[in-house]
């Protein structure tokens, strides 16, 4: 078994066709993460009902993150271009203006627009767990949204573009920044996952977010019939096969649900108890699961969900050990309709049209990752923002978002 071989297992033995895959790498080059209880570990995970696909997806997620971090360490050691944004512009170099503190000294790396123009990008916007070289200001680094690994760079870029668009559409909808409400879908996952959801007495609430032409973005929440215990997943892709997007989003929500019963999540909840706004991915997921009726806040709660005047569940009591819950009654999920269209969509073009700005690509493939047969690409789309952490003051919905 190679270091990149995931463990594929069944979270519910009575539903052996529903699979989770996980694989981890440890290194002093990594920073501690909340998902690993502070350990210097990077994890790749996936869910599905085809063993080879689950293993491939979990391995790909690990490789994209490891490749990105290690490419960052190489760039940090070389420290080839350290400057302020203004200094780069005075040298006649195209550079993406960083948000906030434009006069800060940073490490910069080369990227290219989709059209091929060279553009410098701040390393903190490219690399996970960025460690600024000496002489640079210490600033927050970016998250994993917008990194993908595939056998070829073009496929990796397309995958990452869908991911960037997905998170921006979720952000805009959750914080009330769109002029349209989410559209409820009479659709739920079928097949092995649908059977598991029905057997566990859970409800799958699926809805579509406002999306630009050429894209469809769906969110799925798994929860008990009374609306408690919510976990979320989302997926963005080309229009025409909503059923596939719903299934992928539902599997993501299932992974989050399973993770709520891990030692790391239980320990985090016992220590934190939701007494302050969430600041990490794990805390956001715990907040949605134990404390917040996010479906009601999003104005998309199904009639099966309990109508509560107070949108916060203050009990905060962990469930039984069943990794995806079991209740006394069932709530069959709906079934997705037929595909609407098979028209191909270029996610890079859709993303550029959505933001009105050039999309920038930075390859972060290391030698070890290339030897594993993949290329890693970071997609940066000015104007498309990731989900923030914690409370966001201002107009619209200010409660913490429910995505871990």
Name each region found by the language model.
Residues 1-316, 328-404:
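Helix-biased "structured C-terminal domain" signature
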